[in-house]
Amino acid sequence: MFLTLDTSTLTLSLALVEREAAEPSEPGGGLRTVEHVVVGPPQKQSEILPGVVGELLARHGVKLAELEGLAVGLGPGSFTGLRIGLATVKSLAYAAGLKVAGASSLAALALEGPEDVPLYVLAVARKDDLYLGAYLRRGGTVEALEPETAMSPQEVAARMAAEPRAVALGPALVDYRAALESHGVAAHRLLPGHAFPSAVELSRLVRFPEERSLQALFAMEPHYVRASEPERNPKFPPLPGPAPSARLKED
């Protein structure tokens, strides 16, 4: 049994999942959702996340240390949300001696799309840009067609014009559907729903390492795609000499 969470949007998705298949490495299969918890605004993830995790485990009589591991959506998405989710997973895993695993939040959304057509999964980025992940879904697996990126709505529309079979889905369509249609994307190619990455679908993508590794735990980073605001506009100029080997993620 393991716990999966995604905080890449303002909506927290948290799932307690157990394995049913004899072969745990079976792609996306053999999993049963014990409970899926969804908590949206106005509640703040930084304030509620530890309590929601504790309450979920308590409802099913499961202790944190009894879990196989903890899994988290790595984005791209909200910089603050990603930091909250990953910090929570790292601290809980370190305290309880658990394995950790992560997967793309956009790929989890692609698992909810139709099969055998290019899927452009869209999430809101900063500066009126959109994160775009291009995938092909086959059953319980997804294939990335190219690296995830960020671009303007107009550029997304141009990409869809160049790939007439592609359809778009994802949380960005809540706010940017009209903008994409104004740039020529037909309404039927913008799929409804899919307002946040589901921890249930994310659970089908994660693969835990065979052994727990502190190095892997501390090395896990969110997939920001683009630099966060503090990295683009540092408060202080860089010091002379070689660049530091570690980057600060704090605002």
What are these regions (language model features)?
Residues 20-34, 38, 44, 99-197, ...:
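Surface "functional belts" at beta-alpha junctions
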Residues 19-23, 86-94, 137:
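A glycine- and small-aliphatic-rich helix-loop capping segment at beta-alpha/alpha-beta transitions
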Residues 69-100:
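DPxDG-like acidic metal-binding loop motif
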Residues 60-64, 115, 160-164, 210-212:
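Glycine-rich phosphate-binding loop signature in dinucleotide/nucleotide-binding domains
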Residues 1-74:
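N-terminal beta-alpha supersecondary unit
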Residues 192-224:
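Glycine-rich phosphate-binding/hydrolytic loop that grips phosphoryl groups
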